[in-house]
Swiss-Prot record:
The disulfide bond which can form in the large chain dimeric partners within the hexadecamer appears to be associated with oxidative stress and protein turnover. Its EC number is 4.1.1.39. It comes from Adiantum capillus-veneris. Mg(2+) binds at K201, D203, E204. The record marks K334 as: Transition state stabilizer. Binds 1 Mg(2+) ion per subunit. Residues 1-2 form a propeptide. One of its GO terms (cellular component) is chloroplast. Keywords: Acetylation, Calvin cycle, Carbon dioxide fixation, Chloroplast, Disulfide bond, Lyase, Magnesium, Metal-binding, Methylation, Monooxygenase, Oxidoreductase, Photorespiration, Photosynthesis, Plastid. Belongs to the RuBisCO large chain family. Type I subfamily. This is Ribulose bisphosphate carboxylase large chain. The modification N-acetylproline is found at P3. It is an enzyme of class 4 (lyase).
């Protein structure tokens, strides 16, 4: 044995596979205000103790590897390691636990959602000791959140820009999502905005395809914006999707939108990536553009109940990366969303301070300090009969987006927009008068339809439309 080996062995080095519990399971640890805290729902493989599984999660998402290495002695692992500080069984589930892990702040690059997620979820989800793993929540300490600029503008600044207060904003996704020419697309935008909507929207997969190149779409949409503004006296917007194959092309599209005088652009933040999203948010902040965020691909990540990342984590990450709107489900309609859980992450998007509330899926108290809030967007299979519930559930600081619920009106696009605007104004007025939207919603819509033929036609065509499916995508 060489002298070097003898010296290293003499101070406790021992090669071989690690027992993670010895180093990374620390139930006596008191969390610090500066720690990033994570709640993982874990399902260990048969025969793997929960403590070993929780410690493995902490190790593999911080300083650990599968064996002891010589270079461990060149740093202070105790300073930099993640710690599994608590484990609790999940009620009603066999062999499933919530593991709480604390990460020291120095593990993360300032202002980088990309680095934060790469560290916490980048590798550990493929660990063989775990049958399934889901990141349920993160606590972002103010010491870290203050290194992010967050939304380009936020809720209050957007309302001031639009001069619209005291009600939810109304939007519409142009359909069919693919296949329209730029001129016909612009025509649909104009008709919807003229009818009373605040926004129209590119669908998430509208980029720059052969049937409609992005520059042509931007030009015809800008014409529709200015014409509808002149006729209605209201500020209008269309979410021009700047998402592209490269960051350089994305920025070129955003610059062109600003030069046209458009008030808002859009990005698919999960498929486009957090680095691209943060770069676009910086540009929007510096140049007075609002930024609408679509969550395309989110269900691939968040829909399984036992494996993946819960959307509340993706929502927090978006608030840090930057966006003024983000799609957040509906509770009603065709897209999945449980009411209390949905309202939990809606509050995490909008509010400055959110208390821990396990009944709503909020595992940690979150203090955003002064970071601006994000408008939650409700969309997907909604129509005028849903308006009372949406107004009551989401409140004023939200965007209610009706695609088929506008363009599917039997009289055309503009009457569809009129029907939605009348229904919204009726619900807001009824609420302000003290009426119960949850109990009297249908009656409020029927009363309004008596003096709005557009709303009456919408009520008739969608009176029997419901989306009632049980969630079956569980492990």
């Amino acid at each position: 044995m060489s002298p070097q080996t003898e010296t290293k062995a003499g101070v406790g080095f021992k090669a071989g596979v690690k027992d993670y519990r010895l180093t990374y399971y620390t139930p006596e640890y008191k969390t610090k205000d500066t720690d990033i805290l994570a709640a993982f729902r874990m399902t260990p493989q048969p025969g793997v103790p929960a403590e070993e599984a929780g410690a493995a999660v902490a190790a593999e998402s911080s300083t650990g590897t599968w064996t002891t290495v010589w270079t461990d002695g060149l740093t202070s692992l105790d300073r930099y390691k993640g710690r599994c500080y608590d484990i609790e069984p999940v009620a009603g589930e066999e062999n499933q636990y919530i593991a709480y892990v604390a990460y020291p702040l120095d593990l993360f690059e300032e202002g980088s959602v990309t680095n934060m997620l790469t560290s916490i979820v980048g590798n550990v989800f493929g660990f063989k000791a775990l049958r399934a793993l889901r990141l349920e929540d993160l606590r972002i300490p103010p010491a870290y959140s203050k290194t992010f600029l967050g939304p380009p503008h936020g809720i209050q600044v957007e309302r001031d820009k639009l001069n619209k207060y005291g009600r939810p904003l109304l939007g519409c996704t142009i359909k069919p999502k693919l296949g329209l020419s730029a001129k016909n697309y612009g025509r649909a935008v104009y008709e919807c905005l003229r009818g009373g909507l605040d926004f129209t929207k590119d669908d998430e997969n509208v980029n720059s395809q052969p049937f409609m190149r992005w520059r042509d779409r931007f030009l015809f949409v800008a014409e529709a914006l200015f014409k509808s503004q002149a006729e209605t006296g209201e500020i209008k917007g269309h979410y021009l999707n700047a998402t592209a194959g490269t960051c350089e092309e994305m920025m070129k599209r955003a610059v062109f939108a600003r030069e046209l005088g458009a008030p808002i652009v859009m990005h698919d933040y999960l498929t486009g990536g957090f680095t691209a999203n943060t770069s676009l948010a910086f540009y929007c902040r510096d140049n007075g553009l609002l930024l609408h965020i679509h969550r395309a691909m989110h269900a691939v990540i968040d829909r399984q109940k036992n494996h993946g990342i819960h959307f509340r984590v993706l929502a927090k990450a978006l608030r840090m990366s930057g966006g003024d709107h983000i799609h957040a489900g509906t509770v009603v309609g065709k897209l999945e969303g449980e009411r209390e859980v949905t309202l939990g992450f809606v509050d995490l998007l909008r509010d400055d301070y959110i208390e821990k509330d396990r009944s709503r899926g909020i595992y940690f108290t979150q203090d955003w300090v002064s970071m601006p809030g994000v408008f939650p967007v409700a969309s997907g299979g909604i129509h005028v009969w849903h308006m009372p519930a949406l107004t009551e559930i989401f409140g004023d600081d939200s965007v209610l987006q009706f695609g088929g619920g506008t363009l599917g009106h039997p009289w055309g696009n503009a009457p569809g927009a009129v029907a939605n605007r009348v229904a919204l104004e009726a619900c807001v007025q009824a609420r302000n008068e003290g009426r119960d939207l949850a109990r009297e919603g249908n009656e409020i819509i029927r009363e309004a339809s008596k003096w709005s033929p557009e709303l009456a036609a919408a009520c008739e065509i969608w009176k029997a439309i419901k989306f009632e499916f049980e969630t079956i995508d569980t492990l």
